[in-house]
From Swiss-Prot:
Belongs to the NDK family. Major role in the synthesis of nucleoside triphosphates other than ATP. The ATP gamma phosphate is transferred to the NDP beta phosphate via a ping-pong mechanism, using a phosphorylated active-site intermediate. This is Nucleoside diphosphate kinase. It catalyses: a 2'-deoxyribonucleoside 5'-diphosphate + ATP = a 2'-deoxyribonucleoside 5'-triphosphate + ADP; a ribonucleoside 5'-diphosphate + ATP = a ribonucleoside 5'-triphosphate + ADP. InterPro entries: NDK-like_dom, NDK-like_dom_sf, Nucleoside_diP_kinase, Nucleoside_diP_kinase_AS. The keyword Methyltransferase does not apply. Keywords: ATP-binding, Cytoplasm, Kinase, Magnesium, Metal-binding, Nucleotide metabolism, Nucleotide-binding, Phosphoprotein, Transferase. One of its GO terms (biological process) is CTP biosynthetic process. It comes from Anaeromyxobacter dehalogenans (strain 2CP-C). Its cofactor is Mg(2+). ATP binds at K11, F59, R87, T93, R104, N114.
Amino acid sequence: MAIERTLSIIKPDGVEKGIIGKIIGRFEEKGLKPVAIRLTQLSKAEAEGFYAVHKARPFFADLVKFMTSGPVVLMVLEGENAVARNREIMGATDPKKADAGTIRKDFATDIEKNTVHGSDSVENAKIEVSYFFPEVQVHAYEWKKLA
Ligand code: GDP
Ligand code: MG
């Protein structure tokens, strides 16, 4: 199994709901280690650039508006198969279709305000991590977890 890094975002609805800690806790419990974290508010240009692949989609303008509507938490998560593992922990894009026990099933409001972002491939993860975090802001460490 490969150790990977992936980009995770706690979206404005997750920050507003006061569940930053709960979400990070789920990642830690499930073997994904935060190796970079920053709370920030995205500019329109940052959100448009980040979601450029969705530019032609009908929901693009609304998505950019939502993603810039309040603070977000940007994170790099590290672990075995981190990209796919993060997507499993998040659940499906539409919370109505998300499996029980996933973040989106438990916390999301709707298909847009769905609480978390996660990179969808190893290749995109590299691009997305470097979009927000220069390498010097990512700090690897070993876990010595309590039993
Ligand atoms: P993800 O990879 O599971 O986050 O989903 P996508 O990459 O397909 O879409 C990016 C984000 O756009 C989603 O997480 C939602 O916030 C939003 N989104 C996706 N589909 C829709 C839609 O049909 N309507 C609206 N309003 N937003 C959507
Ligand atoms: Mg996506």
